[in-house]
Amino acid sequence: MAVKRSANGSKHSAPLKRGDVLWRAVGAEVGGHIVREWYGSGPHRLILAGVMTLDGGILRIGPDGDPFDIASPSRRFAVSLHRLDWLPDLVAAGSDGARRALRLLDDWRRVFGKWNGFSWSPECLERRVFHLACAAKALAAEGSDAEIADLTLDIARQGRHLVEIGKSPERALERAVAATIAGCVLAGKPGEKLIDQGLKAFARHIDLMVLADGGHATRSPEAGVELLFDLLTLDDALGQRGRPSPESLSRAIDRLSTATRFFTLGDGHLAAFHGGEAIAPAHIAAALAHDDAGPRPLNAAPHSGYQKMVGGSLEVIADCGRPPAGSLSVSACAQPAALEIVCAKDRLITSCGWSPEAAGAHAFRLSDAASTVSVGDGSAGRPLSGFRARALGAWLVDGATQVEAKRHDDVGGVWLDIVHDGWRHVGLTHARRLFLDAVNDELRGEDSLTPIAAEPGAADGPRRYLPFAVRFHLHPEARASIARDGKSVLIRGPNNIGWWLRNDAVDVAIAPTAHFDHGLARKAGQVVLKSQVRPEVGAKIRWKLTRAEG
């Protein structure tokens, strides 16, 4: 469904009117910061009082202090500082916030106004240009003529530099969008030229990054939602400029909106795969506020590589695709056939939820950090490290190259079979068979490891065993206990509804793990179904998740 537009810039309930999306995009980011706030007072009030909290770090600068002349507590904090991630918070504070923002921008300009390897890097520049363009009107309303001239020059210079960047191709579309929005707030020929340059780059990348089913090319659901915010902002900015939006822009917005609905699970949060986090319902609602009458959510996203199973009080989403390759894989995870399961509105089964905000914790991108199979002490893929990672980025390599998914729906439920070669380095293929029984409100699963090319008589040769486990990572708000039989596991979520996980594994354990929220680790648990596998023979573990009585 196409985005609905209006010349009226006032705020009303969805669908949004033109002129509202810029503020909604900024407002959603403000909401994200408020969620991260530890002190109970709004972030803008903290900044006005001289305390900056960004990405888990705290810097006390005083009411008139200069954060750009003080060492940041961490690199993550410094990136967020130079991206101006604090700017939406100050814009939300009204006149006082805008005046403080102008002073902080002057502090930044004095030290970093000319090119700098860190501050002008793609990871800082793209969001900084976006924030400056979105906040330009509010800042100009409080600025002097000199401050407005400086702000205009900042947007023009940085916007032009943005379209010239050739690094980080996985963010090329987002850079084109930010540059075009910057052009929309600049008057005259400079603005028109930047718009034309930005739209030209946009046209090159839009259909490469937004897949036919609305998924993002990185396979991260969160990346798709954040891109949707950017495209809505771009659509609004072009309209305010009097420029028509490209058809490809409207099409991408429609597709991303459909995918956002698909990836939103029954607990209201987003599914967390491939470096994306389970963002909050309010953030999702803001992304979809432009059109509240969208199409019925799909049960499959074949281009993105995901399947969803819904029946009774159970909802399952499964990763059924190959990991992205090359630069698109800098946030990808080696977790083929991973599951997230929502039971009666409680997200019980998830993954560790790694995202780039977790900084260097790349071990959580490996197979044993998700609800899937692990073999030995290896992984179905790995991120680059050392010199290659410094040169190229933390690309994911040696991942699954062949992944097949077959689905069958009938009156009684849904069958889903996933087969992949992610464990080919140990000579095994993993097959995960799932059946969601809508009648009995249960999910049955079978995880099999089979030899890729078993030679005749191999089973009679020397016996070599590898540890084999099926892991179910629990949400931090879920708890689990093992029954007296030593096998069955009772899992309960916030609603206190119990679910039995029964299985035929050799051994069962509940082990500690971590779950990341905005890059910060929370304590969580995982249920580990253990067995052993002979690569020449194979092995399987069967399990069933069913609602507990009473």
Give the location of each predicted region.
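Extreme N-terminal leader/anchor segments
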Residues: 1-62
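Asp/Glu-centered strand-loop micro-motifs enriched in Gly/Pro and often flanked by an aromatic residue
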Residues: 54-78, 91-93
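Short capping micro-motif at the N-terminus of alpha-helices
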Residues: 61, 318-319, 350-352, 491, ...
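CBM-like, beta-strand-rich accessory domains located in the C-terminal region of large
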Residues: 69, 126, 362-550
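Aromatic-lined, polymer-binding surfaces characteristic
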Residues: 74-253
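Residues that flank catalytic or metal-binding motifs in active/ligand-binding sites
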Residues: 82, 305, 337, 369, ...
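Carbohydrate-active enzyme catalytic cores, enriched for enzymes
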Residues: 211-354, 524, 534
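Catalytic core of carbohydrate-active enzymes
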Residues: 315-401
